[in-house]
């Protein structure tokens, strides 16, 4: 299905709006449109990038007044002749126009099929095609900036540059194989090592950016933890500015992890309100605490809450569970309004989740943990899990090649390791190694039908 030349059609806008857009693409796109469109001139005679007013007609009956935008190959999104029909947003009108188009020779597009055609026509590389879905799904300024940069090319040029350098190294090594009987060394081993180390550093820098990129794309996970009844759910409600979570004086009320998303200055944070941590014989509460520990493990930021009364009673200030080295920790002392004279231990933040004291300061601190400056200064940031896995595999292959270089690995085996690096780096964009149909289907199944 991916490589056929059918003319395809699909709605490009969500249902429910005042207006709708229907997209059609393929060799017969304009001829098919002419069978149902009545305007001043045939669309087949129209130039690209022109808009035409007319009517959609069904067996002589006017269905709707529309505008049709014409795109000519190869200067269209898909690289094919294409048109976009702008009509009124009635679901009946949209479904009728699609029925007329399919009856006239088009077929309904599958998920992401327009973008598949753009990729196969060389209009986009794979990473740019994936960014189309990301930009549609973006829910914050930072996530939009990340997806928009990738859609404009992102690190595609840098990766292709790496592939070219690696191909040069491989060519020199394989030239040695052609002259193996003469024992000629075309690739100076010291220079080869230096070049491979530079490439490895570039790959590692891209890999290391994934933590930030994925957090921006998916939302920064923040686990709200602490003993029962310290005000965790009240804090989440205060951050949301609504009574989203049930609050009770009864210890152990929260038994499941509750997730809510909050946009703080252009970055989405995923707050995980967790069950209070304590020793208990209650089986359901124990299960909730186990889920709390799982939430802590996957969080980028951990908020550990206590309160003034517990501090006065000698409760520990620091959490008693382990944290990863890359996790940020915030210790909050809640209910400071009930004990204004209670001294705050060093490194803690005093708040009152009930009346809002210290909440804006908490928001600023959370936002400061996410450095998005790189997004707006052209730094390459990886946010796609497939790209991260490909770069990890490339880095592993390059390290094997470096180890082999140091141990005197045979030239043909060394060349093969470098070719593995090229394969994995090239799989990110798909330009240096054409992706399989299974990979394409997996990637484009995440796109909406009209894209």
Model features per residue range: what roles?
Residues 1-145, 149, 153, 325, ...:
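A glycine-rich (often HGG/GG-containing) alpha/beta subdomain
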Residues 271, 305, 332:
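Generic enzyme active-site microenvironment
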Residues 52-72, 252-280, 298-301:
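Switch I (G2) and immediately adjacent beta-strands of P-loop GTPase domains
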Residues 16, 27-29, 72-76, 90-92, ...:
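Conserved nucleotide-binding/hydrolysis micro-motifs of P-loop NTPases
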């Amino acid at each position: 299905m991916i490589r056929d030349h059918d003319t395809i059609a699909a709605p490009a806008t969500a249902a429910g709006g005042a207006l709708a857009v229907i997209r059609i693409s393929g060799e017969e796109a304009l001829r098919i449109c002419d069978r149902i469109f009545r305007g001043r001139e045939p669309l087949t005679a129209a130039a690209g990038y022109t808009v035409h007013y007319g009517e959609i007609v069904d067996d002589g009956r006017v269905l709707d007044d529309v505008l049709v935008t014409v795109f000519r190959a190869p200067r269209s999104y898909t690289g094919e002749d294409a048109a976009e029909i702008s009509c009124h947003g009635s679901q009946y009108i949209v479904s009728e126009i699609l029925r007329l188009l399919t009856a006239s020779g088009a077929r309904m597009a599958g998920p992401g099929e327009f973008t598949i055609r753009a990729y196969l026509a060389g209009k986009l590389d794979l990473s740019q095609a994936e960014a189309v879905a990301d930009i549609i799904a973006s829910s914050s300024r930072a996530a939009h900036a990340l997806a928009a940069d990738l859609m404009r090319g992102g690190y595609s040029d840098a990766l292709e540059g790496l592939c070219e350098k690696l191909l040069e190294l491989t060519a020199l090594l394989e030239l040695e194989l052609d002259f193996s009987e003469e024992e000629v060394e075309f690739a100076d081993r010291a220079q080869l090592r230096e070049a491979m180390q530079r490439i490895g550093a570039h790959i590692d820098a891209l890999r290391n950016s994934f933590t930030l990129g994925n957090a921006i794309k998916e939302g920064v996970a923040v686990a709200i933890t602490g003993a029962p009844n310290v005000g965790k759910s009240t804090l989440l409600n205060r951050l949301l500015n609504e009574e989203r979570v049930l609050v009770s004086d009864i210890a152990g009320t929260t038994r499941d992890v509750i997730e809510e998303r909050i946009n703080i200055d252009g970055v989405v944070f995923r707050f995980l309100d967790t069950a209070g941590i304590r020793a208990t014989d209650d089986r359901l509460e124990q299960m909730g605490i186990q889920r709390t520990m799982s939430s802590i493990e996957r969080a980028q930021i951990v908020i550990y809450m206590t309160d003034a009364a517990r501090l006065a009673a000698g409760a520990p200030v620091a959490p008693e569970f382990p944290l990863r080295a890359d996790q940020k920790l915030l210790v909050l002392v809640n209910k400071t309004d009930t004990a204004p004279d209670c001294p705050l231990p060093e490194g803690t933040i005093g708040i009152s989740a009930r009346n809002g004291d210290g909440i804006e300061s908490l928001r600023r601190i959370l936002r400061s943990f996410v450095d998005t400056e790189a997004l707006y200064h052209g730094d390459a940031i990886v946010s796609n899990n497939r790209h991260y896995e490909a770069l990890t595999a490339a880095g592993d292959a390059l390290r094997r090649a470096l180890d082999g270089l140091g141990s005197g690995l045979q030239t043909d085996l060394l060349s093969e390791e470098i070719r593995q690096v090229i394969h994995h780096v090239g799989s990110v964009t798909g330009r240096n190694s054409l992706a399989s149909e299974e990979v394409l289907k997996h990637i484009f199944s995440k796109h909406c039908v009209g894209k």
